[in-house]
Amino acid sequence: MKRKLFSILSVFLLLTMLTSTVSAGGNIKLSGAFRLGSLIFDGTLTGVGGYTEGVTVTLTATGNPVVTCTNQGGSQAPGQNPPKVTTSGNQFIEPSDIDEKGKAGVSVETDEPVLTAKRAGCPSNRWTVSMVVYWTDANVVVTDSATGVRLLEQVYTCDPTQQTATSVSCTLVSETSFH
């Protein structure tokens, strides 16, 4: 009788431990919107309460630059056939930034893209490059900071024709949860 009771309690304890470990990560969801600076994603991340070392959010974006080349005398000329630019940025979300419900705010910004004057299509590298990027694609990836394991990936397509000086319209085209 004791052996049977011990076996039942052991199985129950094991199931309880497995359930709490599996649910530690929760059902990770990310919602938000894009805005401009370089490219910025602001939103809310949920289901990350069990990540004791925090999580990292990485934003990678690709776009078409419109380039203006300026020489030392101040004369300007458009760049010729500049290549697409890709840039990224990270935000580390510390455990203390995650509330008791497993929710955290997200504000991740890509670095400013850089093109040399020559790559931008300017006559020489002595010219100064200024550019506006019309974003076409964005990827947001959430990883476990302790293990580097990918938890969530969202892929967006951005509409350059809807971009203004301060806003951009990006549509979620796919979402993959890895946990």
Predicted regions and their residues:
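Mature extracytoplasmic or otherwise solvent-exposed domains
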Residues: 24-179
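Sec-dependent, cleavable N-terminal signal peptides
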Residues: 1-24
